Protein backbone atom coordinates (compact mmCIF):
# COMPACT_ATOMS: atom_id res chain seq x y z
CA UNK A 1 0.00 0.00 0.00
CA UNK A 2 1.29 3.47 -0.81
CA UNK A 3 0.23 7.05 -0.20
CA UNK A 4 -1.61 7.00 -3.49
CA UNK A 5 -3.34 3.66 -2.93
CA UNK A 6 -6.74 4.08 -4.64
CA UNK A 7 -8.35 1.85 -2.01
CA UNK A 8 -7.98 4.53 0.66
CA UNK A 9 -9.35 8.00 -0.01
CA UNK A 10 -7.59 10.12 2.62
CA UNK A 11 -10.06 12.99 2.24
CA UNK A 12 -12.96 10.62 2.89
CA UNK A 13 -11.48 9.80 6.30
CA UNK A 14 -12.46 13.28 7.46
CA UNK A 15 -11.29 14.89 10.68
CA UNK A 16 -9.56 12.27 12.82
CA UNK A 17 -8.94 12.20 16.57
CA UNK A 18 -5.98 10.15 17.77
CA UNK A 19 -7.00 9.16 21.29
CA UNK A 20 -3.90 9.00 23.48
CA UNK A 21 -2.84 9.36 27.09
CA UNK A 22 -5.90 8.59 29.16
CA UNK A 23 -5.93 7.63 32.83
CA UNK A 24 -4.59 4.07 32.93
CA UNK A 25 -1.27 2.83 34.31
CA UNK A 26 -0.09 2.72 30.68
CA UNK A 27 -0.60 6.45 30.07
CA UNK A 28 3.09 7.11 29.33
CA UNK A 29 3.25 4.39 26.70
CA UNK A 30 -0.04 5.55 25.19
CA UNK A 31 1.32 9.06 24.71
CA UNK A 32 4.31 7.61 22.85
CA UNK A 33 2.06 5.41 20.70
CA UNK A 34 -0.34 8.24 19.94
CA UNK A 35 2.44 10.65 19.08
CA UNK A 36 3.84 8.23 16.52
CA UNK A 37 0.44 7.52 15.00
CA UNK A 38 -0.41 11.23 14.81
CA UNK A 39 2.81 12.06 12.98
CA UNK A 40 2.39 9.11 10.61
CA UNK A 41 -1.20 9.97 9.68
CA UNK A 42 -0.32 13.60 9.07
CA UNK A 43 2.53 12.48 6.81
CA UNK A 44 -0.10 10.75 4.66
CA UNK A 45 -2.27 13.86 4.45
CA UNK A 46 -4.83 12.91 7.11
CA UNK A 47 -6.46 15.76 9.05
CA UNK A 48 -5.44 14.21 12.38
CA UNK A 49 -5.42 15.77 15.85
CA UNK A 50 -4.33 14.61 19.31
CA UNK A 51 -7.12 14.04 21.84
CA UNK A 52 -6.41 13.10 25.46
CA UNK A 53 -9.48 11.80 27.34
CA UNK A 54 -7.75 12.66 30.61
CA UNK A 55 -8.05 16.34 29.73
CA UNK A 56 -11.10 16.50 27.45
CA UNK A 57 -14.51 14.89 27.66
CA UNK A 58 -15.27 12.41 24.88
CA UNK A 59 -18.49 14.29 24.14
CA UNK A 60 -16.32 17.07 22.70
CA UNK A 61 -15.44 14.78 19.78
CA UNK A 62 -18.91 15.23 18.32
CA UNK A 63 -19.02 18.93 19.05
CA UNK A 64 -15.69 19.48 17.27
CA UNK A 65 -16.69 17.58 14.17
CA UNK A 66 -14.50 14.48 14.39
CA UNK A 67 -15.59 11.80 11.95
CA UNK A 68 -13.51 8.87 13.24
CA UNK A 69 -11.05 7.95 16.00
CA UNK A 70 -7.77 6.08 16.06
CA UNK A 71 -7.61 4.53 19.53
CA UNK A 72 -4.01 4.64 20.77
CA UNK A 73 -5.07 4.25 24.40
CA UNK A 74 -3.78 1.28 26.38
CA UNK A 75 -5.20 -0.50 29.41
CA UNK A 76 -8.26 0.49 31.41
CA UNK A 77 -10.62 3.08 29.96
CA UNK A 78 -8.93 2.63 26.61
CA UNK A 79 -9.04 -0.95 25.39
CA UNK A 80 -11.56 -2.43 27.83
CA UNK A 81 -14.75 -1.55 25.96
CA UNK A 82 -15.58 1.63 27.87
CA UNK A 83 -14.26 4.15 25.33
CA UNK A 84 -15.59 1.94 22.56
CA UNK A 85 -19.06 2.08 24.15
CA UNK A 86 -18.92 5.86 24.42
CA UNK A 87 -17.95 6.16 20.75
CA UNK A 88 -20.82 3.84 19.82
CA UNK A 89 -23.23 6.22 21.57
CA UNK A 90 -21.64 9.19 19.81
CA UNK A 91 -21.81 7.39 16.47
CA UNK A 92 -18.12 7.95 15.74
CA UNK A 93 -16.32 4.99 14.09
CA UNK A 94 -13.17 3.84 15.87
CA UNK A 95 -10.25 1.52 15.25
CA UNK A 96 -9.93 -1.95 16.71
CA UNK A 97 -12.45 -4.42 18.10
CA UNK A 98 -15.91 -3.47 19.30
CA UNK A 99 -17.33 -3.15 22.80
CA UNK A 100 -17.79 -6.81 23.68
CA UNK A 101 -14.54 -8.10 22.14
CA UNK A 102 -12.53 -5.29 23.76
CA UNK A 103 -14.06 -5.94 27.16
CA UNK A 104 -13.48 -9.69 26.98
CA UNK A 105 -9.90 -9.40 25.71
CA UNK A 106 -9.00 -7.02 28.55
CA UNK A 107 -10.07 -9.69 31.05
CA UNK A 108 -7.36 -12.37 30.88
CA UNK A 109 -9.37 -14.88 32.88
CA UNK A 110 -12.49 -14.59 30.71
CA UNK A 111 -10.33 -14.72 27.59
CA UNK A 112 -8.66 -17.94 28.75
CA UNK A 113 -12.02 -19.51 29.56
CA UNK A 114 -13.34 -18.76 26.08
CA UNK A 115 -10.18 -19.97 24.38
CA UNK A 116 -10.15 -23.18 26.40
CA UNK A 117 -13.82 -23.79 25.56
CA UNK A 118 -12.96 -23.37 21.86
CA UNK A 119 -10.16 -25.92 22.12
CA UNK A 120 -7.33 -23.39 21.95
CA UNK A 121 -4.16 -24.03 23.98
CA UNK A 122 -3.54 -21.73 26.95
CA UNK A 123 -1.58 -22.41 30.17
CA UNK A 124 -3.43 -23.81 33.18
CA UNK A 125 -4.52 -21.15 35.67
CA UNK A 126 -6.30 -20.35 38.89
CA UNK A 127 -8.35 -17.30 39.87
CA UNK A 128 -7.39 -16.26 43.41
CA UNK A 129 -8.62 -13.69 45.90
CA UNK A 130 -6.10 -14.03 48.74
CA UNK A 131 -2.45 -14.80 49.41
CA UNK A 132 -3.51 -18.16 50.88
CA UNK A 133 -5.27 -19.07 47.63
CA UNK A 134 -2.15 -17.95 45.75
CA UNK A 135 -0.05 -20.35 47.82
CA UNK A 136 -2.54 -23.13 47.09
CA UNK A 137 -2.36 -22.34 43.36
CA UNK A 138 1.44 -22.53 43.54
CA UNK A 139 1.22 -26.02 45.02
CA UNK A 140 -1.20 -27.09 42.27
CA UNK A 141 0.45 -25.40 39.27
CA UNK A 142 4.06 -25.85 40.35
CA UNK A 143 7.10 -23.63 39.99
CA UNK A 144 7.63 -21.24 38.38
CA UNK A 145 4.19 -19.61 38.41
CA UNK A 146 3.10 -16.26 37.00
CA UNK A 147 0.95 -14.02 39.22
CA UNK A 148 -0.65 -11.00 37.55
CA UNK A 149 -3.74 -8.76 37.57
CA UNK A 150 -6.51 -10.06 35.35
CA UNK A 151 -7.09 -6.66 33.71
CA UNK A 152 -3.76 -4.90 33.19
CA UNK A 153 -1.23 -4.82 30.39
CA UNK A 154 2.47 -4.21 29.76
CA UNK A 155 3.37 -6.75 32.50
CA UNK A 156 2.22 -4.24 35.15
CA UNK A 157 1.79 -5.96 38.54
CA UNK A 158 3.30 -9.23 37.28
CA UNK A 159 5.57 -11.51 39.34
CA UNK A 160 7.32 -14.74 38.42
CA UNK A 161 7.02 -16.83 41.58
CA UNK A 162 9.67 -19.50 42.18
CA UNK A 163 9.08 -20.29 45.86
CA UNK A 164 6.13 -20.57 48.23
CA UNK A 165 7.45 -17.66 50.27
CA UNK A 166 6.97 -15.25 47.35
CA UNK A 167 3.24 -15.88 47.03
CA UNK A 168 2.01 -13.29 49.54
CA UNK A 169 4.04 -10.42 48.07
CA UNK A 170 3.15 -11.43 44.51
CA UNK A 171 -0.55 -11.51 45.35
CA UNK A 172 -0.44 -8.11 47.06
CA UNK A 173 1.33 -6.52 44.10
CA UNK A 174 -1.20 -7.88 41.60
CA UNK A 175 -4.17 -7.02 43.83
CA UNK A 176 -3.06 -3.38 43.91
CA UNK A 177 -4.06 -3.23 40.26
CA UNK A 178 -7.09 -5.54 40.16
CA UNK A 179 -9.19 -7.44 42.73
CA UNK A 180 -9.17 -10.39 40.33
CA UNK A 181 -5.73 -12.00 40.37
CA UNK A 182 -4.61 -14.65 37.89
CA UNK A 183 -2.12 -17.38 38.78
CA UNK A 184 -0.84 -19.02 35.61
CA UNK A 185 1.41 -21.97 34.92
CA UNK A 186 4.76 -20.77 33.58
CA UNK A 187 5.70 -22.06 30.13
CA UNK A 188 9.44 -22.45 29.65
CA UNK A 189 10.43 -21.85 26.04
CA UNK A 190 10.41 -19.30 23.24
CA UNK A 191 8.42 -16.10 23.73
CA UNK A 192 6.69 -14.93 20.57
CA UNK A 193 4.06 -12.46 19.44
CA UNK A 194 2.00 -12.18 16.28
CA UNK A 195 -0.20 -9.32 15.00
CA UNK A 196 -3.48 -9.86 13.17
CA UNK A 197 -5.17 -7.47 10.73
CA UNK A 198 -8.69 -7.63 9.29
CA UNK A 199 -12.00 -9.17 10.24
CA UNK A 200 -13.74 -12.51 10.06
CA UNK A 201 -12.77 -14.63 7.08
CA UNK A 202 -10.48 -11.80 5.89
CA UNK A 203 -8.41 -11.74 9.11
CA UNK A 204 -4.76 -12.53 8.46
CA UNK A 205 -1.70 -12.96 10.67
CA UNK A 206 1.45 -10.94 10.03
CA UNK A 207 4.94 -12.43 10.52
CA UNK A 208 5.75 -13.88 13.95
CA UNK A 209 8.29 -12.09 16.16
CA UNK A 210 10.50 -14.06 18.55
CA UNK A 211 11.54 -12.14 21.67
CA UNK A 212 14.76 -12.54 23.64
CA UNK A 213 14.82 -10.47 26.83
CA UNK A 214 17.64 -10.37 29.42
CA UNK A 215 17.29 -13.45 31.65
CA UNK A 216 13.92 -13.95 29.99
CA UNK A 217 12.59 -10.87 31.81
CA UNK A 218 10.39 -9.08 29.28
CA UNK A 219 9.06 -6.55 31.78
CA UNK A 220 7.72 -2.99 31.43
CA UNK A 221 11.22 -1.45 31.38
CA UNK A 222 12.61 -3.89 28.83
CA UNK A 223 9.51 -3.53 26.65
CA UNK A 224 9.60 0.23 26.24
CA UNK A 225 12.69 1.91 27.61
CA UNK A 226 15.80 -0.18 26.90
CA UNK A 227 17.55 -1.58 23.85
CA UNK A 228 18.77 -4.82 25.43
CA UNK A 229 15.80 -6.94 24.37
CA UNK A 230 16.33 -8.66 21.02
CA UNK A 231 13.51 -9.05 18.51
CA UNK A 232 13.77 -11.54 15.68
CA UNK A 233 11.59 -10.98 12.62
CA UNK A 234 11.83 -13.21 10.66
CA UNK A 235 11.46 -15.27 13.81
CA UNK A 236 13.97 -17.95 12.87
CA UNK A 237 11.44 -20.61 13.86
CA UNK A 238 10.83 -23.61 11.61
CA UNK A 239 8.30 -22.72 8.91
CA UNK A 240 5.77 -25.25 10.22
CA UNK A 241 5.93 -23.73 13.73
CA UNK A 242 5.41 -20.21 12.38
CA UNK A 243 2.42 -21.30 10.31
CA UNK A 244 0.89 -23.05 13.33
CA UNK A 245 1.30 -19.95 15.49
CA UNK A 246 -0.35 -17.84 12.79
CA UNK A 247 -3.22 -20.30 12.49
CA UNK A 248 -3.80 -20.32 16.25
CA UNK A 249 -3.70 -16.54 16.68
CA UNK A 250 -6.19 -15.99 13.87
CA UNK A 251 -8.55 -18.51 15.46
CA UNK A 252 -8.07 -16.86 18.86
CA UNK A 253 -8.82 -13.45 17.31
CA UNK A 254 -11.97 -14.68 15.60
CA UNK A 255 -13.16 -16.60 18.66
CA UNK A 256 -13.20 -13.39 20.71
CA UNK A 257 -14.94 -11.51 17.90
CA UNK A 258 -12.09 -9.10 17.17
CA UNK A 259 -11.91 -6.82 14.15
CA UNK A 260 -9.49 -4.24 12.80
CA UNK A 261 -6.28 -5.28 14.47
CA UNK A 262 -4.77 -6.93 17.54
CA UNK A 263 -1.62 -8.72 18.68
CA UNK A 264 -1.49 -12.10 20.40
CA UNK A 265 1.30 -13.30 22.70
CA UNK A 266 2.32 -16.96 22.54
CA UNK A 267 4.85 -19.15 24.35
CA UNK A 268 6.33 -22.21 22.64
CA UNK A 269 7.13 -24.88 25.22
CA UNK A 270 10.72 -26.02 24.85
CA UNK A 271 10.06 -29.65 25.78
CA UNK A 272 7.63 -30.43 22.96
CA UNK A 273 7.38 -27.18 20.90
CA UNK A 274 3.68 -26.82 21.73
CA UNK A 275 2.35 -23.22 21.45
CA UNK A 276 0.31 -21.68 24.28
CA UNK A 277 -1.75 -18.49 24.00
CA UNK A 278 -1.10 -16.04 26.83
CA UNK A 279 -3.25 -13.03 25.95
CA UNK A 280 -4.40 -10.78 23.13
CA UNK A 281 -3.92 -7.01 22.97
CA UNK A 282 -6.70 -5.15 21.17
CA UNK A 283 -4.95 -1.75 21.18
CA UNK A 284 -1.30 -2.72 20.78
CA UNK A 285 1.62 -0.38 21.29
CA UNK A 286 2.76 1.76 18.36
CA UNK A 287 5.97 3.16 19.88
CA UNK A 288 9.49 2.93 18.50
CA UNK A 289 9.90 -0.33 20.44
CA UNK A 290 6.51 -1.74 19.47
CA UNK A 291 6.02 -5.05 17.73
CA UNK A 292 3.10 -4.58 15.35
CA UNK A 293 5.02 -2.01 13.26
CA UNK A 294 8.06 -4.32 13.24
CA UNK A 295 6.05 -7.27 11.97
CA UNK A 296 4.19 -5.13 9.43
CA UNK A 297 7.47 -3.77 8.11
CA UNK A 298 8.72 -7.33 7.60
CA UNK A 299 5.69 -7.94 5.38
CA UNK A 300 6.28 -4.76 3.37
CA UNK A 301 3.93 -2.37 5.20
CA UNK A 302 5.58 0.85 6.39
CA UNK A 303 4.63 2.46 9.71
CA UNK A 304 2.64 5.31 8.10
CA UNK A 305 0.83 2.92 5.76
CA UNK A 306 0.05 0.59 8.67
CA UNK A 307 -1.52 3.50 10.58
CA UNK A 308 -3.51 4.50 7.51
CA UNK A 309 -4.73 0.94 6.94
CA UNK A 310 -5.85 0.58 10.57
CA UNK A 311 -7.59 3.97 10.46
CA UNK A 312 -9.43 3.05 7.26
CA UNK A 313 -10.81 -0.05 9.03
CA UNK A 314 -12.51 2.07 11.73
CA UNK A 315 -16.09 0.99 12.29
CA UNK A 316 -18.95 0.69 14.76
CA UNK A 317 -20.69 -2.35 16.20
CA UNK A 318 -23.90 -0.72 14.99
CA UNK A 319 -22.61 -0.91 11.40
CA UNK A 320 -21.57 -4.54 11.65
CA UNK A 321 -24.86 -6.28 12.34
CA UNK A 322 -24.93 -8.99 14.96
CA UNK A 323 -22.74 -11.41 12.98
CA UNK A 324 -20.22 -8.72 12.08
CA UNK A 325 -20.03 -7.41 15.63
CA UNK A 326 -19.10 -10.91 16.69
CA UNK A 327 -16.25 -10.82 14.22
CA UNK A 328 -17.64 -13.49 11.92
CA UNK A 329 -16.62 -16.64 13.77
CA UNK A 330 -15.85 -18.72 10.76
CA UNK A 331 -13.67 -21.80 11.18
CA UNK A 332 -10.02 -21.25 10.35
UniProtKB/Swiss-Prot annotation:
Q: Which residues bind Mg(2+) 1?
A: 265, 279
GO BP, sorted A to Z: cell wall organization; peptidoglycan biosynthetic process; regulation of cell shape
E.C. number, please? 6.3.2.4
Q: Give the enzyme class.
A: ligase
Protein keywords: ATP-binding, Cell shape, Cell wall biogenesis/degradation, Cytoplasm, Ligase, Magnesium, Manganese, Metal-binding, Nucleotide-binding, Peptidoglycan synthesis
Sequence positions that bind Mg(2+) 2:
279, 281
Q: How is the cofactor bound?
A: Binds 2 magnesium or manganese ions per subunit.
Q: Which GO terms describe its molecular function?
A: ATP binding; D-alanine-D-alanine ligase activity; metal ion binding
Spell out the family assignment given in the record's similarity comment.
Belongs to the D-alanine--D-alanine ligase family.
**What protein name applies here?**
D-alanine--D-alanine ligase
Amino acid sequence: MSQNDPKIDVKALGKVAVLMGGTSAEREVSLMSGGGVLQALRSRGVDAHAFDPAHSDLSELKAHGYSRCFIALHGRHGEDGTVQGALELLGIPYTGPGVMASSIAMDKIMTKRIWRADGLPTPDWRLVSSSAETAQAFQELGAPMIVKPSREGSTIGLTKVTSLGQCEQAYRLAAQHDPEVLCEQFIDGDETTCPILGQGAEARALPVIRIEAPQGNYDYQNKYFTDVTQYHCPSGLPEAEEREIQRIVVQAYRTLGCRGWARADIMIRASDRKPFLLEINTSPGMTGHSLVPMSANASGISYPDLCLRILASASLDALQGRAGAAGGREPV
